[in-house]
């Protein structure tokens, strides 16, 4: 007899006679909806898309349950206390610049590549995009710069002139696939655990080079935070995993994101606080990229970037306007309000 499992996140039918301790993968916590973000109290995954929220894989393994569980309404505010683990209260008072300076590591390790997590929806979009698409078709050679790299994944050719078009392009027409630590391309069956070996895999198709020029993109981007994680979100259509990378050290972040149409978003910043690089990651979705930075110490950040970083960008005339969505207004001396701007203008007028 087949029974329906009522564990949250499962919903599968099972045979009671073959119900084992690892048969069910479910969420023991409760759903959390906060400022358009949706997730479970028992794990860190957050999304703004409701269908992706429903498809978040369970974080706990156990027995299937045939008894209907009592309904628990979604929690409308910040992270809930899980029945398995008591969470620490959010420290809403940002640390001062002096405290941040004392706590920053004295010696910096070189930035490391953060792992890229490709959503199932993006994988489908990339596979649809590759159908009947010949790279490099219709490109005007007069628009190609000498020294431009071929944009096809797996090809490292460099444009030296019209004669470069005569050389074959060996590339991967498919999309990258990352599953349970294994990395491969959808167009060929070679799988590897090492990310460097994955990038070095030779292409499986021969075609034309794609010398398309990458255009700087003015992408909308914002950030939000919880007690333990800071999330920087960059919005754009169809990020291309093969060309994207994000590097981070404990106090610095370097971002290079390529979207469909060869539009590129780049950013470099010193972070307000210290992060745990090993636990941080990047999630790629059809309409955005989320960079999740795990804080080294729980607490609130007054802003995303360190004051020194903002001052340097202001002097260079490239100050990035970041919109912090979740945290409350800070009384920190580093905050600058419109009223203070008006007072300064009046003082200068006198």
From Swiss-Prot:
It holds the Pfam family CHORD. May play a role during maturation and/or organization of muscles cells. Interacts with beta-1 integrin subunit. This interaction is regulated by divalent cations, and it occurs only in absence of calcium. This is Integrin beta-1-binding protein 2. Zn(2+) 4 binds at residues 172, 187-188, 204. Induction: During muscle regeneration. Residues 216-305 form the CS domain. A motif (SH3-binding) lies at residues 28-31, 70-79, 173-176.
């Amino acid at each position: 007899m087949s029974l329906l499992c009522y564990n949250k996140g499962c919903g599968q039918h099972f045979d009671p006679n073959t119900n084992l301790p690892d048969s069910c993968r479910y969420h023991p916590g409760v759903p959390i909806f906060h400022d358009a973000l949706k997730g479970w109290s028992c794990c860190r995954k957050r999304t703004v898309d409701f269908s992706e929220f429903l498809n978040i894989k369970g974080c706990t393994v156990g027995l299937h349950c045939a008894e209907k569980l009592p309904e628990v309404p979604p929690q409308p505010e910040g992270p809930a206390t899980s029945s398995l683990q008591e969470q620490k209260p959010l420290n809403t008072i940002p640390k001062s610049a002096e405290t941040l300076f004392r706590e920053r590591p004295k010696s910096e390790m070189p930035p490391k590549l953060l792992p890229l997590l490709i959503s199932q929806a993006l994988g489908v979009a990339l596979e649809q995009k590759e159908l009947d698409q010949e790279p490099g078709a219709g490109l005007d050679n007069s628009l190609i710069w000498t020294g431009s790299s071929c944009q096809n994944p797996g090809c490292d050719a460099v444009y030296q002139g019209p004669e470069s078009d005569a050389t074959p392009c060996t590339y991967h027409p498919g999309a990258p696939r990352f599953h349970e630590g294994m990395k491969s391309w959808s167009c060929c069956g070679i799988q590897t655990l090492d990310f460097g070996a994955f990038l070095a895999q030779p292409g499986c198709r021969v075609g034309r080079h794609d010398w398309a020029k990458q255009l700087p993109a003015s992408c909308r981007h914002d950030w939000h935070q919880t007690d333990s994680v800071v999330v920087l979100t960059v919005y754009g259509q169809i990020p291309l995993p093969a060309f994207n990378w994000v590097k981070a050290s404990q106090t610095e972040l370097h971002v290079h994101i390529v979207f469909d149409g060869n539009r590129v978003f780049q950013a470099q910043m010193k972070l307000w606080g210290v992060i745990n690089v090993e636990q941080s990651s990047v999630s790629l979705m059809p309409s955005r990229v989320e960079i999740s930075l795990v804080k080294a110490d729980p607490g609130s950040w007054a802003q995303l970037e360190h004051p020194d970083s903002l001052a340097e960008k202001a002097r260079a005339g490239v100050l990035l306007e970041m919109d912090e969505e979740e945290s409350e207004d800070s009384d920190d001396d580093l905050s600058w309000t419109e009223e203070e701007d008006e007072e300064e203008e009046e003082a200068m007028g006198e």
